[in-house]
Amino acid sequence: MNTNRFDVIVIGGGHAGTEAAAAAARLGRSTLLITHNLETIGALSCNPAIGGIGKGHLVREIDALGGVMGRLADASAIHARVLNQRKGPAVRATRIQADRPTYARAARRALDALPGLALLQDAAEELLVADQRCYGVRTESGATLHADAVVVTAGTFLAGQIHIGHVQHSAGRAGDPAADRLSASLRDLGLAVHRLKTGTPPRIDRRTVAVEQLDAQHGDTPRPLFSPFRPPEAPLPEAACLISWTTPETHRIIRDALDHSPMYSGAIQSSGPRYCPSIEDKVVRFADRDHHQVFLEPEGLDATELYPNGVSTGLPFTVQEALIRSMPGLEAARITRPGYAIEYDYLDPRGLTPWLESATIAGLYLAGQINGTTGYEEAAAQGLIAGLNAARVSAGEDPWFPTREEAYIGVLIDDLVTTGVTEPYRMFTSRAEHRLRLRDDNAEDRLTEVGRRLGSVGDDQWTRFARYRDALNAERARLNGTRVHPGRLTASQQARLGGALRRDQTLFDLLRRPELSYDDVRFIGGLEEADLPVRAVQQLEIEARYDGYVERQELENQRHQRYAQVRLPEALDYAAIDGLSTEVRERLTRMRPATVGQAARLPGVTPAAISLLLIHLRRRGWLRTPTGGEDAA
């Protein structure tokens, strides 16, 4: 066996690299994961949390395709909630707080358990390319490693530069060296390299926090899961989050120190994540606000550190101390690790195919923050797709990628490769025009059979899913096949119905009524109880009540396509359009798209924003049913 020859080489052991290596190995390809430190595989470099709105949808889809992130999150969860429970099912999403060391250990165990996957502690320094094909990697130790495909998942390590006030130093993250030579290798290949910025807050010693003065936020019971068909064997105990907030004094401290912030002193010119701004940006952009909520998230069950979510900063250490101590409950808090801003290289994702292979260098795949995204979940989703396709193409098979209609992963990738990024890309449900169909509750229905065909879904997961699917389909058929008739209901059934029944209806039709539960319609129909898990019952209720909304959204999407060629008035005032986000207003005002279709293709302009734009045009009398490319004005 040639120990320097592999089917797939993955560079980087973060969330994208973990998914890429695991996916390639699951498909039976000999795989090598190279990372500068084996002890940091799967590290939660920033916040100790997985999921959230849009992001949780990605994790559910990763799991449905056989990926590992959902399973790792469940195994390390110490706090879990379903967000947006008062809103519609399409925007509900799971978010967990993870025990940081447990998550990393679980990631390492998951990789160690895969036959055909080797790990190497080394630094990849040069991509080997000949005739526009990548055939391997040269490392810091001098090793030359060959492969049919190479997946680069370098995170913030490409020419990474940390800023704390006016102090700067090279690093991929605190305590880890930057990958300067790998970045230079990418530039030497003629790839379009640019810079982005992100940041992290200081960590706080929990023992110096007045816990009794702060409200606690507990998780949901029962604890929600990302991976329902691969549940953890021994769930961890819960740890509550604490809630504090910034004060007018906090904001004064920050405003007085803006000249020392790398984002405001000119030291950093690149764009940061709009939806995860630094505390400096919050104070400047929302000058009318006198406070911002701060969640103090536990780093782990045995950890003494708290992560203050909401105060990412690159201010000097002394300023960080002052602003932390100006918040309730933190008056005596001690910082254990300073926050910092970090700049890093990324590549223009418009140079990629939809299966994340370079359009100019065959066999080279890119995934994660190197493509301009932010967040563990976005990185993991890309890593999964890149790893699957590196494995498939190296085996002579056709590449595969999900479409926008199939998955949030498809929305993510299509946005990246079609419109590119000008700031770190974060997933939101509003980015998906088919979001009513792409729900958290039906990820397996949409993708697990696909994952099985691809070879990514294992036997145990498939068996559990198939059992669930069959039970769900059988009960759906039973509800659709059982009719109730006016005048044939007993008094108790009529009482449960809560009103008159004017015509024959199936039980599934009755389930569309929001006031009736699954148990209600089963009782009304005289059906015996079925052996269904709770989530199957919930899914049936959601399906019944959402069918009409899904159809309506599909009609709306078709309407958007019809109006794509409608021209926009040159003097259109986007600030006057109700409901548009600041990001969308700024982008439309700056870019001045000529048509509705051009507006829809701009980064950050969501399908929901296009609907608001069309409503505005119609109200002003500027919109007519298109028969061609006529002017809206």
Curated annotation (Swiss-Prot):
FAD binds at G12, G13, G14, H15, A16, G17. NCBIfam families: mnmG_gidA (TIGR00136). GO terms for cellular component: cytosol. This is tRNA uridine 5-carboxymethylaminomethyl modification enzyme MnmG. The keyword Transmembrane helix does not apply. Homodimer. Heterotetramer of two MnmE and two MnmG subunits. Its cofactor is FAD. GO terms for molecular function: flavin adenine dinucleotide binding. Its main location: cytoplasm. The gene is mnmG. NAD(+) binds at residues 272-286. Keywords: Cytoplasm, FAD, Flavoprotein, NAD, tRNA processing. Belongs to the MnmG family. HAMAP family: MnmG_GidA. It is found in: Cytoplasm. One of its GO terms (biological process) is tRNA methylation. NAD-binding protein involved in the addition of a carboxymethylaminomethyl (cmnm) group at the wobble position (U34) of certain tRNAs, forming tRNA-cmnm(5)s(2)U34. PROSITE patterns: GIDA_1, GIDA_2.
